[in-house]
Curated annotation (Swiss-Prot):
This is Heat stress transcription factor A-6b. Exhibits temperature-dependent phosphorylation. Homotrimer. PROSITE patterns: HSF_DOMAIN (PS00434). It comes from Arabidopsis thaliana. It comes from the Eukaryota. Belongs to the HSF family. Class A subfamily. One of its GO terms (molecular function) is transcription cis-regulatory region binding. It is found in: Cytoplasm; Nucleus.
Length: 406
């Protein structure tokens, strides 16, 4: 006899009629026929069955909270389902960490959330954004969350690991480590940024070198300009201290002007000689008066054309004085060339004038004179010389105006 089966007490048999009075104790009978049937055939009895999934554990709270977080349409600007509804995307990790994680979890660390996804087998779909997917994490199919299992990790190296099936191994091979994959992408991005920064640094260094060289050239030019300015101021100060300097320049200028006038007169003599020849030829031939008159008119026109407008091309007295100061030694050689051009009966007289002019220039304005004049004024103080410079300018202006009036 099976001890699990017991007699069932029949409290309300079929023949018992309802009555307002409670039944007596003798009315409770045991059905012997039912007991015998249960003993003979136990399958005829119906056992109470548990509800489906009663002994199964539900999905982990992490997956449930994550699903509710993604399903909420009010936070689609931060996290939402993808277009294919088989993955979810975190659009704003900063806002996700600050606002949503503390609401559903006990932390606000986005990296911890990603590591937790990794332990449940989520994979990162797109390396350029935070998009995660799992075969059991689908939109509108929350009941599939129970199929997602947490990976078992053992810290004890001596613990025996259970062998996995070929299917599970293939799934693990295709599964991407989410946290590590994200770190690799960030490292690649940092390497690219480093390379770009290195190229920019090299370009800036080259630009700095070129700018430094340019500034060095500018400084050298500025120093040369300042030295020339100091020499000019020293020269002007020295000229103001030497009252005979201006007088010597004026006398030298007058002598040069006399020599130029003498040279211009001597150049006109061949033209005058030709005129006399025409007149003589006219006297001998008998009809030369008309020819002489016409030739004299032509000669006068040519002289007027040649020498009449020389004043337009003459330099001002101040310009000549400046040129004379800058290159007085070169003027003597130029004068020699001009004087050597003159040929004729007066060649000896011109050479004597040239030698006297050259001798006077060497005596008065030799190389030693200019060198001493510049060297003596190198350390001169220019603070109180503004009045002397103004006087020099007035004297130079007086010389220019007097030359034009003459």
């Amino acid at each position: 006899m099976d001890p699990s089966f017991r007699f069932i007490k029949e409290e309300f048999p079929a023949g018992f009629s309802d009555s307002p009075s409670p039944p007596s104790s003798s009315s409770y009978l045991y059905s012997s026929s039912m007991a015998e049937a249960a003993i003979n055939d136990p399958t005829t009895l119906s056992y109470p069955q548990p509800l489906e999934g009663l002994h199964e554990s539900g999905p982990p709270p992490f997956l449930t909270k994550t699903y509710d977080l993604v399903e909420d349409s009010r936070t689609n600007h931060v996290v939402s389902w993808s277009k294919s509804n088989n993955s979810f995307i975190v659009w704003d990790p900063q806002a996700f960490s600050v606002t949503l994680l503390p609401r559903f979890f006990k932390h606000n660390n986005f990296s911890s959330f990603v590591r937790q996804l990794n332990t449940y087998g989520f994979r990162k779909v797109n390396p350029d954004r935070w998009e995660f997917a799992n075969e059991g994490f689908l939109r509108g199919q929350k009941h599939l969350l129970k199929n997602i299992r947490r990976r078992k990790t053992s810290n004890n190296s001596n613990q025996m690991q259970q062998p996995q099936s070929s299917e599970q191994q293939s799934l693990d091979n295709f599964c991407i480590e989410v946290g590590r994959y994200g770190l690799d992408g960030e490292m690649d991005s940092l390497r690219r940024d480093k390379q770009v920064l290195m190229m920019e640094l090299v370009r800036l260094r080259q630009q700095q070198q070129s700018t430094k060289m340019y500034l060095t050239l500018i400084e050298e030019k500025l120093k040369k300009t300042e030295s020339k300015q100091k020499q000019m101021m020293s020269f002007l100060a020295r000229a103001m201290q030497n009252p005979d300097f201006i007088q010597q320049l004026v006398e030298q200028k007058e002598k040069r002007k006399e020599i130029e006038e003498a040279i211009s007169k001597k150049r006109q003599r061949p033209i005058d000689q030709g005129k006399r020849n025409v007149e003589d030829y006219g006297d001998e031939s008998g009809y030369g008066n008309d020819v002489a008159a016409s030739s004299s008119a032509l000669i006068g026109m040519s002289q007027e054309y040649t020498y009449g407008n020389m004043s337009e091309f003459e330099m001002s007295e101040l310009d000549k004085l400046a040129m004379h100061i800058q290159g007085l030694g070169d003027n003597s050689s130029a004068r020699e060339e001009v004087l050597n051009v003159e040929k004729g009966n007066d060649e000896e007289e011109v050479e004597d004038q040239q030698q006297g002019y050259h001798k006077e220039n060497n005596e008065i304005y030799g190389e030693g004179f200019w060198e001493d004049l510049l060297n003596e004024g190198q350390n001169f103080d220019f603070e109180g010389d503004q009045e002397n410079v103004d006087v020099l300018i007035q004297q130079l202006g007086y010389l220019g105006s007097s030359s034009h009036t003459n």
